[in-house]
């Protein structure tokens, strides 16, 4: 087709050209058809969920991560082009993007290599979800002071027990910790725990159901979600862009154009008569 990088570079030497593939430009997998779940499988994230069998993230995560990787790479290339006048060819693979994304936390216990390395538990094992009287909550109880505040609030002496006395001890005895904490909060309401723990800076949040997200007071305050009316689909809810520019905080409040939405407008600019 003549639209590869080398062909276009002859016409526009300083072009920034990005190509996205599943597995990269070389190797035994380059001709495979690729979907997000396949990248989750190859990159190891499906094995990182710590269940009896591998499971996928319940979202199409690496399609989106690769898009963000491309946007970041292009932005960097644009800065370099402004400084040097040179373009770039940016080959980006979903696999590399996935590995780069998950490595700092998913693979933190596999980073150091050697015979004498003591591997730590998976990071997210230390972040369980707890059941309260009415809802689920997430609490980060790594810091001694945070764990003590929870125990004091629930009138418990767990923080004085040797097996839970320090962060290392709590991580080491994680299963026992989860059971013990679940027991002392089982009769407490989630709103009460969040409100009181928040007063002392303890990291805590209610686990929203998918039907509750738009009712969360922080989401409402930030106007994180907007509602529009689509000419075909009807009324719909969607997130606003997560960034704000200094001089432009208003974002489009209409749907993406459907096929042919702007035909008349564009054709009229090309002096095509209405009758045609």
Task: Give names to the regions the model predicted.
Residues 165, 229-275:
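Flexible, small-/acidic-enriched active-site or ligand-binding loops
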Residues 125-200, 204:
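Aromatic-enriched alpha-helical interface/lid elements that frame and gate functional surfaces
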Residues 199-251:
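A glycine-rich dinucleotide-binding beta-alpha-beta segment and adjacent secondary-structure elements
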Residues 65-72, 145-148, 175, 191, ...:
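A structural signal for well-ordered alpha-helical segments within the folded catalytic domains
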Residues 70-77, 149-153, 180, 212, ...:
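Alpha-helical scaffold segments in soluble metabolic enzymes
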Residues 2-137, 142:
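Active-site-adjacent "lid/gating" segments in soluble enzymes
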Residues 3, 156, 219, 272-273:
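Helix N-cap/coil-helix junction residues
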């Amino acid at each position: 087709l003549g639209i590869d990088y080398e062909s276009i570079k002859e016409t526009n030497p300083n072009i920034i050209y990005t190509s996205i593939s599943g597995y990269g430009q070389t190797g035994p997998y380059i001709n495979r058809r690729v979907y997000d779940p396949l990248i989750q499988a190859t990159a190891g994230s499906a094995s990182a969920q710590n269940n009896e069998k591998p499971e996928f993230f319940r979202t199409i995560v690496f399609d989106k991560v690769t898009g963000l990787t491309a946007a970041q790479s292009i932005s960097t290339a644009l800065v370099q082009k402004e400084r040097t006048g040179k373009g770039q060819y940016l080959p980006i693979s979903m696999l590399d993007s996935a590995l780069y994304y998950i490595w700092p936390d998913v693979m933190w216990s596999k980073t150091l290599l050697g015979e004498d390395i003591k591997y730590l538990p998976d990071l997210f094992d230390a972040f369980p979800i707890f059941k309260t009287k009415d809802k689920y909550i997430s609490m980060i109880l790594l810091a001694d002071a945070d764990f003590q505040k929870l125990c004091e609030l629930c009138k418990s002496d767990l923080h004085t027990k040797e097996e839970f006395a320090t962060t290392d001890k709590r991580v080491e005895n994680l299963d026992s910790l989860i059971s013990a904490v679940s027991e002392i909060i089982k009769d407490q309401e989630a709103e009460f725990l969040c409100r009181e723990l928040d007063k002392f800076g303890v990291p805590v949040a209610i686990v929203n159901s998918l039907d509750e997200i738009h009712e969360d007071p922080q989401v409402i305050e930030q106007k994180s979600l907007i509602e529009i009316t689509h000419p075909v689909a009807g009324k719909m809810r969607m997130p606003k862009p997560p960034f704000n520019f200094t001089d432009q905080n208003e974002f489009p409040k209409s749907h993406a154009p459907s096929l042919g939405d702007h035909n008349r407008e564009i054709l009229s600019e090309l002096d095509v008569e209405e009758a045609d």
